[in-house]
């Protein structure tokens, strides 16, 4: 089912991404704690398990996020996002186009694009109507140990060229999140730094505390 009441994507904050190992009640409890800690958006990232379980967990997550007033994004699959009634989808390089995702989800759905270390890919995604882009991995990642690395310099340049929100991902925790925020990231995306913590709400709160007042509009290079 298509969601008829999509929530907007946040302009800044913590982007909490659920790990595949959490399912059922454990997934819901951890996600609720992340939201209580201040997460601005949650991404559901199921990579294994029966399709029926992914669907039922996703529906419960969507209900939780909707009650909290924050968007739920589904990783990789516009079809699963539509079945759940999620607010949007996050696409990697092999997951299809912005237009294809909107055909499944509707024109008001959130569509985010992984851009790795490619500013060109990010500019193209923005031109195609993406709601946000993500760069990474900025640091060694336990979730994706073989992921290619992105540079802080790419974040800095993206901050002067893009008007849509920029998320940073990959090995981000409280020791380095300040670097990526300072380099231009509007959101920090985290899996283990949040859901691997003994106190999920506290971990989320500590990451959220690194954000300051909303930024003014970023200048484009052609504004001069």
Curated annotation (Swiss-Prot):
What are the record keywords, sorted?
Magnesium, Metal-binding, Thiamine biosynthesis, Transferase
Chain sites annotated for binding 4-amino-2-methyl-5-(diphosphooxymethyl)pyrimidine? 43-47, 75, 114, 144
Q: One GO cellular component term, please give it.
A: cytoplasm
Q: Where along this sequence does the record place binding of 2-[(2R,5Z)-2-carboxy-4-methylthiazol-5(2H)-ylidene]ethyl phosphate?
A: 141-143, 171
Which terms does the record give in the GO molecular function aspect? magnesium ion binding; thiamine-phosphate diphosphorylase activity
Q: Which reactions fall under this protein's catalytic activity?
A: 2-[(2R,5Z)-2-carboxy-4-methylthiazol-5(2H)-ylidene]ethyl phosphate + 4-amino-2-methyl-5-(diphosphooxymethyl)pyrimidine + 2 H(+) = thiamine phosphate + CO2 + diphosphate; 2-(2-carboxy-4-methylthiazol-5-yl)ethyl phosphate + 4-amino-2-methyl-5-(diphosphooxymethyl)pyrimidine + 2 H(+) = thiamine phosphate + CO2 + diphosphate; 4-methyl-5-(2-phosphooxyethyl)-thiazole + 4-amino-2-methyl-5-(diphosphooxymethyl)pyrimidine + H(+) = thiamine phosphate + diphosphate
Give the SUPFAM superfamilies listed for this entry: Thiamin phosphate synthase (SSF51391)
Q: Which superkingdom heads the taxonomic lineage of this protein's source?
A: Bacteria
What cofactor is this protein dependent on?
A: Mg(2+)
Q: Where does Mg(2+) bind?
A: 76, 95
Which EC number applies? 2.5.1.3
**An example of a Gene Ontology BP annotation on this entry?**
thiamine diphosphate biosynthetic process
- A Pfam family annotated for this UniProt entry: TMP-TENI
Details of cofactor binding: Binds 1 Mg(2+) ion per subunit.
Associated pathway: Cofactor biosynthesis; thiamine diphosphate biosynthesis; thiamine phosphate from 4-amino-2-methyl-5-diphosphomethylpyrimidine and 4-methyl-5-(2-phosphoethyl)-thiazole: step 1/1
Record-linked HAMAP family? TMP_synthase
| Protein family according to the UniProt entry | Belongs to the thiamine-phosphate synthase family.
| Role this protein plays | Condenses 4-methyl-5-(beta-hydroxyethyl)thiazole monophosphate (THZ-P) and 2-methyl-4-amino-5-hydroxymethyl pyrimidine pyrophosphate (HMP-PP) to form thiamine monophosphate (TMP).
**Can you say what this protein is called?**
Thiamine-phosphate synthase
